[in-house]
């Protein structure tokens, strides 16, 4: 990919950031690997990741409901519907109605598999969260995920394998702390 013209590298970042599941979580490390300028690739990845969001919010649920009974696409559409419903239920359980904005922001903003703008938007539409509120929370979440991925990619680029292990250690500690906090909350109830 080193022989690609510079503008095509940025177009690649833009296109990858629009792909479900991969989103900017995949686009930013690619941009870093291609040696692109963070001040250019970051906004390009954000825009690419956000471009499908209004369309997903307004139409995806309807299209998925329509297609779930179709022979060729039914299984995939059903899987997408179940993922959206599951994501919506998780958000509602963890946040309640009042904290749904911040729950949606964090859900999209923490770069874990299956928690990006696509899933967050689908969950927001299943929960019937107001369009403007959803778009605002998802935008902030995408910005947060972009910052986290950019920092992580820079750390790996600078520190190599040590950076990879450092990031893995940080993630494992965060998961462990989360588990401990949940257990303490359940013990109090």
Residue ranges and their predicted role:
Residues 53, 145-150:
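Hydrophobic transmembrane alpha-helices of multi-pass small-molecule transporters
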Residues 1-13, 34-108, 156-189:
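Membrane-interfacial helix-loop-helix
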Residues 17-18, 49-50, 109-113, 142:
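Residue-level hotspots within the lipid-embedded alpha helices of multi-pass solute transporters
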Residues 18-21, 93-98, 139-146:
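Short hydrophobic alpha-helical membrane-embedded segments
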Residues 18-30, 111-122:
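Transmembrane helix boundary and interhelical junction motifs in multipass membrane proteins
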Residues 15, 43, 47, 136-144:
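Hydrophobic residues within alpha-helical transmembrane segments
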Residues 31-38, 120-138, 144:
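Interfacial segments of multi-pass membrane proteins
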